[in-house]
Design a protein with these regions (language model features):
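N-terminal Sec/ER secretory leader and immediately downstream segment
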Residues: 27-140
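Signal peptide processing junction and immediate N-terminal pro/mature segment
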Residues: 19-28
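Short, charged, amphipathic alpha-helical segments
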Residues: 114-118, 138-139, 178-181, 203-208, ...
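Bacterial N-terminal signal peptides that target proteins for export
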Residues: 1-9
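Extended amphipathic alpha-helical interaction segments
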Residues: 143-226
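Bacterial N-terminal signal peptides
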Residues: 9-17
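Secondary-structure edge/capping motif, primarily at the C-terminal ends of alpha-helices
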Residues: 101-108, 127, 131, 166-170, ...
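A cross-kingdom marker for long, charged
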Residues: 224-279
Length: 279
C-alpha cells in the first residue's frame, strides 16, 4: 500500500520533468515547444527525475481503484473555467485537473472526461506544452464516446511520456514541481474525502507518508525568493506542515477518522487558495 500511495502523489502526475531551475515569475505564459526529446536514464538522473515527479499513471490508477467504491459526487468539483493569471497557480491547477481526470476514469464518469480533456489542453497551452497534449486529448475524447476506459488510460500514459519531454525542453524545474504538487494536493483532497466517508485502517495508511510530504516541503523550500514572499508559497509551506502533524506520528499510529477529516479540510483549503488570485 505504501508503494501505491507514493504514486498517488499525483505529483508530477503526467506533466513533470525537471531541469535547471528558473524563477516562476520569470517565465512567460506561453512558449513554443520543440519536438519531444528522448529522455535517457542518465538524463533522468541528472535532471532529478524520480518516482515522485514522474509516477506511472498505470500504478496511480491502480491506487485509486484500491479506494473503490468511490463516492464520486462527494469528492468531485467544478473544473476551473479559465486559466489562472499567474504561472505558479496555473502549474498547480494543471496538476489538479489531471487528478480530476484520474478520478473520472476510476469512477467511469463518461460525462466528465470531455471537460477534463479540454481544461487540460487549455492549461497545458498556457504552460507552453499544449502541442504535446492536444493529440492525446482528441483520442481521449473519441474513446470516451464508446467508454473505452482501457484506451483512455493508454492515452494518458502517452500524454505523460510526451509532456515529460516537453517540460524538459522548457527547462523549467520549478513549474514541473508545482504541477506535481498541485496534483498531489488535489489527490490528497480526493483520497481523504473518500476515507472520510468510508474509513478503513488500510486506507488510512495512504495518509501516513512522511517521505512524500518531506519531499514536497524540500522542493518548495528551494524555490525562487520572490515566490517565497507570496501568500501562495506560505500556504503551501504551512499546510504541508499541518498535514504532516496529523498524518505522521512518532508511534507510527495511523490517522483516526477525525484526523483524516481534518486532513481533508486542510487539502480543500489549500486547493481553494490555489484557485484564488494573489492580492
Amino acid at each position: 500500500m505504501q508503494r501505491l500511495f507514493r504514486h498517488l502523489t499525483f505529483a508530477a502526475l503526467t506533466l513533470t520533468a525537471l531541469a535547471p531551475a528558473k524563477s516562476v515569475a520569470q517565465k512567460p505564459a506561453v512558449r513554443a515547444v520543440p519536438a519531444v526529446p528522448t529522455i535517457s536514464a542518465h538524463m533522468r538522473e541528472e535532471l532529478g527525475i524520480n518516482e515522485f515527479t514522474t509516477p506511472s499513471i498505470a500504478v496511480l490508477l491502480k491506487a485509486l481503484i484500491a479506494l473503490r467504491p468511490v463516492p464520486y459526487d462527494d469528492v468531485a468539483r467544478e473544473l476551473p473555467a479559465q486559466n489562472p493569471a499567474d504561472r505558479a497557480r496555473l502549474a498547480l491547477s494543471t496538476g489538479a485537473v489531471i487528478a480530476d481526470g484520474f478520478l473520472a476514469i476510476v469512477a467511469e464518469k463518461q460525462s466528465r472526461i470531455e471537460p477534463v480533456a479540454r481544461a487540460l489542453v487549455r492549461q497545458a497551452k498556457g504552460l507552453g506544452v499544449g502541442e504535446h497534449v492536444t493529440r492525446h486529448s482528441r483520442s481521449i475524447l473519441e474513446k470516451a464516446v464508446v467508454k473505452n476506459w482501457a484506451g483512455i488510460q493508454k492515452e494518458l500514459i502517452g500524454t505523460q511520456r510526451d509532456v515529460e519531454g516537453g517540460m524538459m525542453a522548457l527547462r523549467d524545474e520549478e513549474i514541473a514541481h508545482l504541477v506535481s504538487l498541485g496534483g498531489w494536493w488535489r489527490g490528497l483532497e480526493i483520497s481523504s474525502g473518500i476515507l472520510s466517508k468510508q474509513y478503513s485502517e488500510q486506507g488510512a495508511t495512504l495518509m501516513a507518508q512522511p517521505v512524500v510530504i518531506d519531499y514536497f516541503a524540500d522542493r518548495i523550500s528551494t524555490m525562487h525568493p520572490n515566490f517565497q514572499k507570496t501568500k501562495l508559497w506560505a500556504g503551501l509551506n504551512n499546510k504541508l506542515t499541518e498535514v504532516r502533524k496529523l498524518a505522521v506520528k512518532p508511534d507510527k499510529a495511523l490517522p483516526t477518522v477525525e484526523e483524516v477529516r481534518a486532513i481533508h479540510a486542510i487539502a480543500k483549503a489549500m486547493n481553494d487558495l490555489i484557485a484564488t488570485p494573489e492580492e
